[in-house]
Amino acid sequence: MALAVRDRERGESALERVRAVAPRTPSSVTLLDLADLASVRALAAREREYALPLGLLVCNAGVYAGSRQRTVDGHELMVGTNHLGHFALTGLLAPRLAAAPSARVVVVSSLAAATAGTPGLGEQEDAPFRGWRAYAGSKLANLLFAAELARRAPALRGDVTVAAAHPGWARTRLLTRRGPGLGSLVTAPAAATLLVQGPDAGAAPVLRAATAPDVRPGDYYGPGGPGQLRGAAVRVELPPLARDEALAAALWHRSEQETGVDYRGRGTSPVGPAALGAEPTTSS
């Protein structure tokens, strides 16, 4: 098992906890910055050197920014990290997934996806920036990516099952850092008791999507309680926009352009950031 992390110290801390419960599992920490496509390619190259099948890939990274920020490659930070980084990593590791007797990809989204109006790949520079709107768009992009990858998985020429999951409203670093309003609500006793669940419970839908034998291609898992905020992990419905196959196909095409990663095995050159729905940029 490899933990791909941006912060080595936190990664090593997580690895110690893994080894405490699974001491015989070969495990390691490797550095990855999903906001830098060169870092994504470097990790994929290192992993290919092992020449071993990959049985499970969990696309779990997520960032939130209250102000407009950019990735190394010039994309809006949240869609660039939360979606494009995962899209590129999964595509570059696809041959290793296909080489496994049975492999699974789990894309972690958020309840925020249901509030998004677009998948948020890029934005108009002159438009007011709304951090929550951009975050929600990146999480919708996660679901559209998972759904489209599930449809395209047979073309990978392997037994690869793709599913998605969300943690409900879990008490995590990401949630408490989304501004004083949400942070105060999360730490309030009433919210902690009635609405918010702990990190372990929040991880349950992801674990079910990753390990349950009855997972079907395109499944989506989340808490089964009211509003999917908390509760036991169950199969849940995708938000309406996440079921839009034309939107998913358009996002896929633009993601290939923006990352330079072609899942059919033909590398392309990144064309740089552009808003979804705009004409692709070209060069002469």
Question: What are the language-model segments listed below?
Answer:
Residues 264-284:
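Actinobacteria-biased recognition of intrinsically disordered, low-complexity terminal regions
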Residues 118-124, 177-182, 222-234:
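Short, flexible, mixed-charge acidic loops at enzyme active sites
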Residues 138, 189-236, 245-249, 253:
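C-terminal helical subdomain
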Residues 3, 32, 194, 240-243:
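Pocket-edge positions in alpha/beta enzyme catalytic cores
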Residues 125-126, 181-191:
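A short C-terminal helix-loop "cap" of Rossmann-like NAD(P)-dependent dehydrogenase/epimerase domains
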